[in-house]
């Protein structure tokens, strides 16, 4: 048997080597860790901190330094006020600030307001760029419409 084939079989776990004559081949049992185990460990750690559940939290938004927001819809929140510890459970979604703007204006702090100003400035510059293109189109359309002359009342001519 060549060494390459032996190494492949050893990697699979199908070859016993060095265990002696009487030892049977045994497959290694793979134990899959579940997230439930992590949750139990987290729960026991939080119980040590004496956390209390906070009811009626509709949403949680965490503002990141790059301007994006981690948004939790209907999360479970536990708090330990003396140790200033908060635990938030739920599915978090990465969203841009523009997606949440109307609903989160009252939640913004001074840092987030600065990023909102930058966002507004970039939006205005985009609008001006689009507006410049539209103005060119408007000027072409204005050639068909005559200018109003002062002193003339066109409504009298209609009647």
From Swiss-Prot:
Residue span of region Disordered: 1-39, 124-159
Domain NAC-A/B: from-to ranges: 36-101
UniProt keyword Cytoplasm present: yes
GO cellular component: cytosol; nascent polypeptide-associated complex; nucleus
CDD domains reported for this sequence: NAC_BTF3
Biased composition (Acidic residues): 136-153
Amino acid composition bias (Basic residues), ranges on this chain: 23-32
Family: Belongs to the NAC-beta family.
Assembly and oligomerization: Part of the nascent polypeptide-associated complex (NAC), consisting of EGD2 and EGD1. NAC associates with ribosomes via EGD1.
Protein name as catalogued: Nascent polypeptide-associated complex subunit beta
Species name: Sclerotinia sclerotiorum (strain ATCC 18683 / 1980 / Ss-1) (White mold)
């Amino acid at each position: 048997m060549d060494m390459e084939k032996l190494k492949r079989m050893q990697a699979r776990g199908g070859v016993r080597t060095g265990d002696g004559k009487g030892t049977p081949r045994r497959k290694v049992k793979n134990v899959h860790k579940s997230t439930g185990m992590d949750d139990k460990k987290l729960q026991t750690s939080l119980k040590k901190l004496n956390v209390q559940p906070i009811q009626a939290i509709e949403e949680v938004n965490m503002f990141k330094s790059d301007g994006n927001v981690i948004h939790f819809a209907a999360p479970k929140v536990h708090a330990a006020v003396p140790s200033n510890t908060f635990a938030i459970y739920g599915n978090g979604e990465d969203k841009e600030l523009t997606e949440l703007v109307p609903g989160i204006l009252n939640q913004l702090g001074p840092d987030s307001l600065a990023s909102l100003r930058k966002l507004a400035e970039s939006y205005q510059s985009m609008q001006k760029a689009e507006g410049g293109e539209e103005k060119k189109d408007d000027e072409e359309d204005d050639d068909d419409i005559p200018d109003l002359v002062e002193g003339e009342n066109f409504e009298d001519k209609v009647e």
